[in-house]
């Protein structure tokens, strides 16, 4: 299906020069002189290489038909993640680098959305929020209330994020997976 370049959004799967790419970032630029154009940062689905392309906003680009399926994450090893299709119970693997830094948010039994192009899995969408345990947090410095201060904390998956000063080691929190930020304490 062909779409105008100005309709490209992060998460789209495009076909360009005979290869399929996952769109990571887009930016529309309107120079003072000349026509507007869009810069697109994208990742080659097969090789994982990142590339940047620039198109005029009126150009047409081939968008791949994507089939989204609900799948359950089973486990990961040194190089692959294993998932199970929730409808057919069929298992498949994907390379660990598909998710990049956010792979630490995957938990056994987590339900995720996997995008398929021509029957092959190409990308994973994590739930927007996940529950994580704080395993390491710096102590609070008393009297430091003049500015809104956040302190670094280490989560059970090894990731470090900034959390409010009242959080302590061992507490369970909710983390936003899109920007790796603290949302709130877990109530439950």
UniProtKB/Swiss-Prot annotation:
Keywords: Cytoplasm, Elongation factor, Protein biosynthesis. InterPro entries: Elong-fact-P_C, NA-bd_OB-fold, Rib_uL2_dom2, Transl_elong_fac_P/YeiP, Transl_elong_KOW-like, Transl_elong_P/YeiP_cen, Transl_elong_P/YeiP_CS, Transl_elongation_fac_P. The gene is efp. Belongs to the elongation factor P family. It is found in: Cytoplasm. It comes from Paramagnetospirillum magneticum (strain ATCC 700264 / AMB-1) (Magnetospirillum magneticum). This is Elongation factor P. CDD domains: S1_EF-P_repeat_1, S1_EF-P_repeat_2. It comes from the Bacteria. GO terms for cellular component: cytoplasm. GO terms for biological process: peptide biosynthetic process. Pathway: Protein biosynthesis; polypeptide chain elongation. Pfam families: EFP, EFP_N, Elong-fact-P_C. PROSITE patterns: EFP (PS01275). Coiled coil: none annotated. SUPFAM superfamilies: Nucleic acid-binding proteins, Translation proteins SH3-like domain. One of its GO terms (molecular function) is translation elongation factor activity. Involved in peptide bond synthesis. Stimulates efficient translation and peptide-bond synthesis on native or reconstituted 70S ribosomes in vitro. Probably functions indirectly by altering the affinity of the ribosome for aminoacyl-tRNA, thus increasing their reactivity as acceptors for peptidyl transferase.
């Amino acid at each position: 299906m062909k779409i105008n370049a100005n309709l490209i959004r992060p998460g789209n799967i495009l076909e360009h020069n005979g290869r399929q790419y996952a769109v990571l970032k887009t930016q529309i630029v309107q120079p003072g002189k000349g026509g507007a154009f869009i810069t697109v940062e994208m990742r080659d689905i097969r090789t994982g290489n990142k590339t940047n392309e620039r198109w005029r906003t009126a150009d047409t680009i081939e968008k791949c038909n994507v089939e989204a399926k609900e799948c359950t994450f089973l486990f990961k090893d040194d190089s692959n993640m294993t998932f199970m299709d929730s409808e057919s119970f069929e298992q498949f693997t994907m390379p660990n680098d598909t998710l990049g830094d956010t792979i630490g948010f995957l938990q056994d039994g987590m339900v995720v959305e996997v995008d398929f192009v021509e029957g092959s899995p190409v990308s994973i969408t994590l739930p927007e929020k996940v529950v994580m345990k704080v395993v390491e947090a710096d102590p609070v410095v008393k009297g430091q209330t003049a500015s809104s201060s956040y302190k670094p904390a280490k989560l059970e998956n090894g990731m470090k994020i900034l959390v409010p000063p009242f959080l302590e080691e061992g507490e369970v929190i909710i983390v936003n997976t899109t920007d790796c930020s603290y949302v709130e304490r877990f109530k439950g």
